[in-house]
């Protein structure tokens, strides 16, 4: 049986935390900031954790990632 390979696009978007969680960065941060409030822009800077409903699927894609 062949080895399971890491999904490279996912590996670039998610980082493992020390406790085993997955950290992600927020969407809507590349352009068109004039339509967003200062508060929205500030909150978009912070990373967040992957939602539990998506965790199992994403974990299998990045299973080999440390």
Curated annotation (Swiss-Prot):
<dbReference type="InterPro" id="IPR021137">
    <property type="entry name" value="Ribosomal_bL35-like"/>
</dbReference>
<dbReference type="GO" id="GO:0006412">
    <property type="term" value="P:translation"/>
</dbReference>
<dbReference type="InterPro" id="IPR037229">
    <property type="entry name" value="Ribosomal_bL35_sf"/>
</dbReference>
<protein>
    <recommendedName>
        <fullName>Large ribosomal subunit protein bL35</fullName>
    </recommendedName>
</protein>
<dbReference type="InterPro" id="IPR001706">
    <property type="entry name" value="Ribosomal_bL35"/>
</dbReference>
<feature type="compositionally biased region" description="Basic residues">
    <location>
        <begin position="1"/>
        <end position="16"/>
    </location>
</feature>
<dbReference type="GO" id="GO:0003735">
    <property type="term" value="F:structural constituent of ribosome"/>
</dbReference>
<dbReference type="GO" id="GO:0022625">
    <property type="term" value="C:cytosolic large ribosomal subunit"/>
</dbReference>
<comment type="similarity">
    <text>Belongs to the bacterial ribosomal protein bL35 family.</text>
</comment>
<dbReference type="InterPro" id="IPR018265">
    <property type="entry name" value="Ribosomal_bL35_CS"/>
</dbReference>
<keyword id="KW-0689">Ribosomal protein</keyword>
<feature type="region of interest" description="Disordered">
    <location>
        <begin position="1"/>
        <end position="20"/>
    </location>
</feature>
<keyword id="KW-0687">Ribonucleoprotein</keyword>
<dbReference type="Pfam" id="PF01632">
    <property type="entry name" value="Ribosomal_L35p"/>
</dbReference>
């Amino acid at each position: 049986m062949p080895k399971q390979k890491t999904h490279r696009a996912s590996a670039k978007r998610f980082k493992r935390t020390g406790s085993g969680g997955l950290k992600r960065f927020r969407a809507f941060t590349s352009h068109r900031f004039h339509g967003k409030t200062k508060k929205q822009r500030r909150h978009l800077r912070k990373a967040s954790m992957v939602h539990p409903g998506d965790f199992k699927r994403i974990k299998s894609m990045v299973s080999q990632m440390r």
